[in-house]
């Protein structure tokens, strides 16, 4: 079986996983089938990078692995990993491109180095509703972005979403953009995200997800923005005083 290069993208919420295999061994596969042989069992490595096992994304990956094994008659096994078990998020994406990891699921910003156009999903308020997001990603706009991965070492399998994003901080309630003036907020390594928060008057600081809780606890940063599931999974409420439902 061809080594699987896979990509599962989170656009804004979560719970839909799709996987596919390669086709470089078409000739040998056809010969084996004609001879009545079955393909040897294969084990794939998959990680939900930057999210915990008990998050919706983590639970979805485990269910995906279970179904793959069931529908393949036991010939496909997926070893599931979570959060930073195989390295930080950026390292997991790079390892997937190199073939060390077979499947990675994480936020769109981590793939900007492969497909810069995907940064459009980093803009706030691009979609007015969940339905609009799904319609966009499931049709031509989403397909156009997915097609750009064909010239990279990654193959995009699907979009999924884990919820609208919201801001937490330890300084003050955020009612208007002016309330963010001078607020040190954690972002991912994304020029689009950083420019967005600067436009709101905040001071963006790029940190890997595995570093965020400690940075908030030590007041290296004042704030972070994430989905409610991530805020809960990482127990951000233990080190943050305010949750602003910004739906960005």
Predicted regions and their residues:
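Short, low-complexity disordered leader/linker segments with a strong preference
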Residues: 1-43
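N-terminal secretory/targeting leader peptides
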Residues: 22-24, 35-131, 150-248
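Residues in and immediately flanking transmembrane alpha helices
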Residues: 15-16, 142, 197
């Amino acid at each position: 079986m061809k080594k699987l290069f896979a990509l599962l993208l989170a656009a804004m919420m979560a719970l839909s996983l799709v996987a596919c295999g390669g086709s470089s061994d078409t000739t040998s596969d056809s010969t084996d089938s004609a001879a009545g042989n079955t393909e040897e069992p294969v084990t794939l490595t998959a990680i939900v990078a930057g999210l915990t096992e008990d998050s919706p994304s983590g639970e979805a990956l485990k269910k995906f692995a279970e179904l793959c094994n069931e529908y393949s008659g036991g010939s496909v096994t997926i070893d599931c990993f979570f959060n930073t078990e195989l390295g930080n998020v950026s390292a997991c994406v790079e390892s997937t491109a190199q073939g060390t990891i077979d499947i990675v699921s994480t936020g769109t910003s981590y793939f900007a180095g492969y497909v810069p156009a995907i940064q459009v999903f980093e803009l706030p308020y691009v979609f007015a509703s969940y339905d609009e997001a799904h319609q966009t990603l499931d049709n031509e706009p989403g397909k156009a972005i997915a097609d750009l991965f064909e010239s990279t070492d990654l193959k995009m399998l699907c979009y999924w979403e884990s919820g609208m994003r919201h801001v937490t901080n330890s300084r003050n309630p955020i009612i208007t953009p002016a309330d963010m003036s001078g607020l040190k907020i954690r972002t991912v390594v994304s020029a689009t995200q950083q420019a967005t928060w600067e436009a709101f008057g905040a001071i963006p600081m790029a940190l890997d997800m595995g570093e965020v809780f400690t940075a908030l606890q030590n007041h290296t940063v004042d704030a972070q923005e994430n989905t409610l599931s991530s805020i809960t999974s990482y127990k951000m409420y233990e080190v943050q005083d305010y949750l602003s439902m910004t739906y960005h």
